[in-house]
C-alpha cells in the first residue's frame, strides 16, 4: 500500500447526524450542540417544500413546512441555519435533489458572507434527480431537464468548488423501492455512467479535469438482510 492510500485509510470518518428541525434557528442550535459534543460534520435534512421548490405560503406546502426537516427558502434562512458555524472547517452533507443547485448556491453565498472562499468548501449534495423518478418522487422538472441541472452543477463545482462532491449516486433508495441487490447496483452504476457521459459530452469540463470529476462522485449504497448476497454485491461494486 502506498503512502497516499495509507493516509486515506487512517483518516477518521466524518461523524454527522442527519437532522433538521422545524426552523432554521432550532436546527442551528441543534447543530452547534452536536458539534460541541464531538460531531465532526453536518448532515442537513430539509422539509418537503424545500425539496420540491415550494415557498412555505404555497397552498401545496400546507401542513408540510418544517415537518420532516428544516425549511430554507432564502439566504437569510441559510445564514441563520449556519450562524456561528465555521463552514470553511465543515464537511457538510445536504440531502437535496431537485433543488440542489439552489441550496448549494445559498450555501456558497453564506460562506462568502463569512469570508470563506468557495474553493475551501467541503461537502456533498445528493443531486441524484434521476433516482427520484425511480423511487422517492421529489422531482420538479422532466428527466432531460433534470439531468441538465445535474450536469451543469457538476461542471460548476469542478471549476469553482473543487473539493465538493456535487452528486451522491443513490442505490439505497432503489432497493427500498423493490430492486434486488444486483439490480440496485446495476441501475445505480448505469445512472452514474450516464451522468458522466453527459458531463463529458456537454463540453463544460476540460479533458484534463475529467478524472477529478469522476473522483468527486460519491455513492449511497443499501445493505439489506441477504447477508451473503450483500457481501458479494459490495465486493463486486468496489472492484
Predicted feature descriptions by range:
Residues 1-230:
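Catalytic alpha/beta active-site cores
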Residues 195, 235-238:
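Glycine-rich ThDP/TPP pyrophosphate-binding loop and its adjacent helix/strand module
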Amino acid at each position: 500500500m502506498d503512502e497516499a492510500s495509507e493516509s486515506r485509510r487512517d483518516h477518521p470518518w466524518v461523524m454527522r447526524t442527519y437532522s433538521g428541525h422545524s426552523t432554521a434557528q432550532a436546527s442551528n442550535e441543534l447543530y452547534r450542540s452536536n458539534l460541541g459534543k464531538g460531531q465532526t460534520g453536518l448532515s442537513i435534512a430539509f422539509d418537503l417544500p424545500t425539496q420540491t421548490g415550494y415557498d412555505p405560503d404555497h397552498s401545496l406546502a400546507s401542513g408540510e413546512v418544517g415537518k420532516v426537516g428544516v425549511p430554507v427558502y432564502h439566504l437569510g434562512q441559510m445564514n441563520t441555519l449556519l450562524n456561528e458555524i465555521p463552514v470553511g472547517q465543515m464537511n457538510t452533507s445536504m440531502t437535496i435533489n431537485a433543488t440542489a443547485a439552489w441550496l448549494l448556491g445559498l450555501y456558497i453565498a453564506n460562506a462568502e458572507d463569512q469570508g470563506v472562499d468557495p474553493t475551501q468548501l467541503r461537502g456533498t449534495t445528493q443531486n441524484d434527480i434521476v433516482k427520484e423518478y425511480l423511487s422517492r418522487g421529489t422531482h420538479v422538472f422532466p428527466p432531460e431537464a433534470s439531468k441538465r441541472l445535474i450536469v451543469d452543477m457538476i461542471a460548476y463545482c469542478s471549476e469553482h468548488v473543487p473539493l465538493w462532491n456535487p452528486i451522491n449516486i443513490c442505490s439505497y433508495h432503489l432497493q427500498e423501492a423493490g430492486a434486488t441487490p444486483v439490480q440496485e447496483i446495476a441501475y445505480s452504476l448505469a445512472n452514474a455512467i450516464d451522468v458522466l457521459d453527459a458531463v463529458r459530452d456537454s463540453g463544460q469540463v476540460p479533458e484534463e479535469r475529467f478524472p477529478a470529476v469522476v473522483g468527486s462522485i460519491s455513492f449511497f449504497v443499501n445493505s439489506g438482510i441477504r447477508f451473503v448476497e450483500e457481501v458479494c454485491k459490495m465486493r463486486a461494486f468496489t472492484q
